[in-house]
């Protein structure tokens, strides 16, 4: 007679069985969570749970202590004032970038300076940005010192207690100061030109016979000359007269840059005296020193922005 096989049966060592092989294997999930018979919770006794919890507490405490020790050792090797790696061959590099103001945070992707001469509201944001940017030069007076012709920030590297040179904003009084609305009201807008801060960087002077033609009549040893022109032939025809303040560009006495409280970044301004009305002019401004490279593709040593001064009647908004 053929033996009927139970579909739910399993074979253990060739012997058919329909029950668990061990008495302590739970039959239901509820028994797995709490087995009253064996006194276990999720398969472990109270003693077993206590041992494994203590083990992992000690293990992770040791791991955290080891990580904190490594972090402390690493932080001790860092200088809070100077990057660990800077200069040639690093991301920071040795070629300072060129920046400009006013740059509106509300339009971070735009390099256009556009306003209407007849509408004060159209250039209010530019005036506010210029004022905000220049405020830092007044607020650090007690942490800076006046530097004469023979003084410079070289003292900061020699003496850590020395104060940085105070930048004098009076060089912009003739047409590019807050009193004259930075020239925007009169249609002669001023733009701030600055260099990025590079630790330890200072301008290298050109030899007398190697000064670029663009700045030959304004170049002064020890300074960074600035030259702005139209980006294209058409722009060069329209840009008109450009005035530089100071005429020699950015004064070299404020270099090298050292990370210290009260440091004031030197700047220059360019004023567009005869820029045409209702025409867009693309401007290219370059900084000149022997150790500043120029590359159009990567925009090294230069900055681009657009200027458009409109002279149109202000359209009054009609109330609905």
Swiss-Prot record:
Alphabetical UniProt keywords: Cell membrane, Disulfide bond, Glycoprotein, Ion transport, Membrane, Potassium, Potassium transport, Signal-anchor, Sodium, Sodium transport, Sodium/potassium transport, Transmembrane, Transmembrane helix, Transport
Is Metal-binding set as a keyword in this record?
no
Membrane topology field: Single-pass type II membrane protein
- Indicate whether Phosphoprotein appears among the record's keywords: no
Instruction: Spell out the disulfide connections.
Output: 176-190, 228-285
The cellular component terms of Gene Ontology attached to this UniProt record, alphabetical and capped at eight, are: sodium:potassium-exchanging ATPase complex
Coiled coil ranges: none
A Pfam family of this chain: Na_K-ATPase
Please give the residue ranges for the topological domain Cytoplasmic.
1-51
Q: What's the family?
A: Belongs to the X(+)/potassium ATPases subunit beta family.
**Function according to Swiss-Prot or TrEMBL:** Non-catalytic component of the active enzyme, which catalyzes the hydrolysis of ATP coupled with the exchange of Na(+) and K(+) ions across the plasma membrane. The beta subunit regulates, through assembly of alpha/beta heterodimers, the number of sodium pumps transported to the plasma membrane. May also function in the peptidic vesicle transport pathway from the endoplasmic reticulum for the defecation behaviors.
User: Which PANTHER family would you find in this protein's record?
Assistant: SODIUM/POTASSIUM-DEPENDENT ATPASE BETA SUBUNIT, SODIUM_POTASSIUM-TRANSPORTING ATPASE SUBUNIT BETA-1
Assembly and partners are described as: The sodium/potassium-transporting ATPase is composed of a catalytic alpha subunit, an auxiliary non-catalytic beta subunit and an additional regulatory subunit.
User: What protein name applies here?
Assistant: Sodium/potassium-transporting ATPase subunit beta-1
